[in-house]
Amino acid sequence: MMDPIPNQSITAWPWPDELDAVTAAPDSHRILLENAHVRVLEILIPPGHREPMHTHRWPSVMLIDVSAAIRYYQADGQTSDYPRRAANAQLPHIGWLEAEGLHAVENRDSVAYHAIRIEIKGR
């Protein structure tokens, strides 16, 4: 049986620990559970708030339960805008994310953005 979770070499991670989301953007990232296998983060970005640049070292499952219009900033200065999910959209929105390099998120909405991120360690 194939492993559905792609492997990632932790030794190849190019960013320092100081840029980890919990350290670099502690106002929007709170650890709910951490062990040798997973780290579960609560992500809360208030309206009008822009997080500091940070990283997520491990691939993860993201569950967005309160959507908001956000702007995603990449390290190279490129931005991407994402609208708030429609009122009739099914929430939570669940997706797979690979490890994320240096980035920041800005909440450009009047509601707080809220998500749970389950990071898979050692992958």
Regions found by a protein language model. Give the residues of each.
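A short, N-terminal "cap"/entry segment at the start of jelly-roll beta-barrel domains
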Residues: M1-E42, R50-M53, Y72, T79-L102, ...
